[in-house]
């Protein structure tokens, strides 16, 4: 399910309410559809996880929003100077007595102002919701009315029936792990999948004599490459210098290694991305962390950026090497 498949259904649904849709809210940088996602549903069905995923996808997110503030918040985000905003995802405070009526009024107001929105409803079966509450040890919001958890969930489900019936998407998360839900939402709502990959890459160059980075997911030992330390004119330089980079990368082993490294990561990173991983830390080490690891890390930064990954780099021991 993708946004392009959802939009026509939204147009049909919202036009049936006697409101023609002339133009959606647009992001500041790309004149394309600007997703506004309203999240409601059963407590424990995954709303907080969904909001975290949307935040990772560069949407502005907020939880516990009263329905009366939704429209004004949409206009605030649309008119702000926030960079790289890809949309807005709002979790609604649905446990006040008059929330359902307020939500209906809010939806009518949004339609009258020609605002596209997707109403995402999350649910799960009763045993699963009870199990999740047992794991988190948090009280259900309706338990404040001196009723038990199961009764609170039943009452919540009853209150939400009108909203569920009008939802654009009803997602049953009973069999979903957190990672399953993340994968589904990333695949369905990444607005620019060919331009922005979900997974973030963190590259660290380091020196083995100072210790291996604890946060490394992938670690490469580069001490097999020719060492510029033993070349007098290169010793005071770092892998950031062109002479050192040329010495390392254009060596016989360097040429072969960089080819195999890029090919390996081109195979592996999409698999991590498809699994719903948020970040991968790649650590590349040499003896002192000044020459070889820095040169290869800078090459990797360049190559992965070309493949549209979001990449950060840290030369942890370059000044010590």
UniProtKB/Swiss-Prot annotation:
Binding site for ATP: 41-48
KW Cell inner membrane (keyword) present: no
Protein name (database record): Nucleotide-binding protein LI0459
Entry function: Displays ATPase and GTPase activities.
SUPFAM superfamilies per record: P-loop containing nucleoside triphosphate hydrolases
Keywords, in A-Z order: ATP-binding, GTP-binding, Nucleotide-binding
Family under the similarity heading: Belongs to the RapZ-like family.
The organism's place on the tree of life at top rank: Bacteria
InterPro entries: P-loop_NTPase, RapZ-like, RapZ-like_N, RapZ_C
Organism: Lawsonia intracellularis (strain PHE/MN1-00)
Annotated GO MF terms: ATP binding; GTP binding
């Amino acid at each position: 399910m993708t946004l392009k498949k959802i939009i026509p259904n939204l147009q049909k649904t919202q036009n049936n309410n006697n409101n023609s849709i002339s133009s959606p809210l647009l992001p500041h940088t790309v004149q394309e559809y600007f997703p506004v996602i309203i999240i409601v549903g059963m407590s424990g069905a995954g709303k907080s996880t969904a909001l975290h995923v949307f935040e990772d996808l560069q949407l502005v997110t907020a939880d516990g929003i009263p329905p009366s503030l939704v429209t004004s918040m949409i206009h605030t985000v649309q008119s702000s100077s926030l960079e790289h905003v890809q949309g807005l995802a709002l979790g609604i405070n649905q446990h006040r007595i008059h929330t359902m009526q307020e939500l209906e009024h809010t939806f009518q107001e949004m339609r009258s102002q020609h605002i596209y929105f997707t109403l995402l409803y999350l649910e799960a079966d009763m045993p699963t919701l009870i199990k999740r509450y047992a794991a988190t040890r948090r009280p259900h919001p309706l338990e404040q009315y001196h009723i038990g958890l199961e009764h609170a969930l039943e009452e919540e489900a009853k209150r939400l029936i009108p909203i569920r019936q009008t939802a654009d998407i009803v997602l049953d998360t009973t069999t979903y792990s957190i990672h399953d839900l993340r994968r589904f939402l990333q695949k369905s709502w990444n607005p620019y999948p060919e331009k922005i990959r979900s997974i973030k890459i963190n590259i660290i160059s380091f020196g083995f004599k100072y210790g291996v980075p604890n946060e490394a997911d992938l670690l490469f030992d580069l001490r097999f490459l020719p060492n510029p330390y033993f070349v007098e004119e290169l010793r005071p330089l770092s892998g950031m210098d062109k002479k050192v980079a040329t010495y390392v990368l254009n060596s016989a082993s360097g040429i072969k290694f960089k080819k195999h490294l890029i090919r390996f990561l081109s195979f592996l990173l999409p698999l991590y991305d498809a699994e719903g991983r948020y970040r991968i830390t790649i650590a590349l080490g040499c003896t002192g962390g000044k020459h070889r690891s820095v040169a290869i890390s800078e090459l990797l930064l360049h190559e992965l950026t070309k493949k549209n990954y979001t990449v950060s780099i840290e030369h942890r021991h370059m000044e010590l090497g």
